[in-house]
């Protein structure tokens, strides 16, 4: 009986550790994407979609990101629910909230070369945050879930060229 209690305690501690990693990774990724978005050099495809939704429907960037992610999560749930776990949902809630928080406190230079380095820092932080989140192994992000759901159900290969 003691072994069972100890095992459950270890599992709970491991889960809590992973959830903390997801939250930290989400915060770092959100800060990174916010730096990159507002540096003034344009954005990636999804960031442009978020900006368009935000302007069209008078939403914040974080809320637009959340709306797109919910749509992708719903698609992945219908198409291949094995891609979605607690980490998928937790990441998106923390990430979208933090994007809105960080968007209110960004300060940029009038020098484009300096903003370029801010954008690079943002991309690096986004990658680090995403890596942290992924290392917890508690579900894919909404965008990755759709990619892997489509790939696995259709026998497509996801690879680096």
Which sequence ranges carry the predicted segments?
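Core subunits and conserved enzymes of cellular information-processing
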Residues: 2-161
């Amino acid at each position: 009986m003691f072994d069972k209690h100890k095992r459950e305690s270890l599992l709970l501690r491991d889960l809590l550790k992973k959830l903390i990693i997801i939250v930290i990774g989400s915060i770092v990724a959100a800060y990174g994407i916010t730096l990159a978005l507002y540096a003034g050099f344009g954005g990636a495809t999804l960031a442009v979609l978020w900006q368009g939704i935000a302007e069209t429907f008078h939403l914040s960037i974080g809320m637009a990101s959340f709306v797109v992610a919910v749509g992708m999560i719903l698609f992945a749930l219908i198409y291949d629910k094995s891609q979605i776990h607690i980490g998928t949902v937790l990441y998106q809630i923390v990430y979208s909230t933090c994007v809105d928080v960080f968007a209110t406190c960004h300060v940029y230079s009038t020098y484009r070369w300096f903003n370029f380095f801010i954008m690079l820092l943002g991309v690096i932080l986004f990658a680090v945050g995403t890596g942290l989140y992924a290392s917890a192994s508690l579900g894919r992000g909404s965008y990755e879930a759709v990619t892997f759901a489509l790939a696995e159900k259709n026998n497509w290969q996801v690879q680096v060229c």
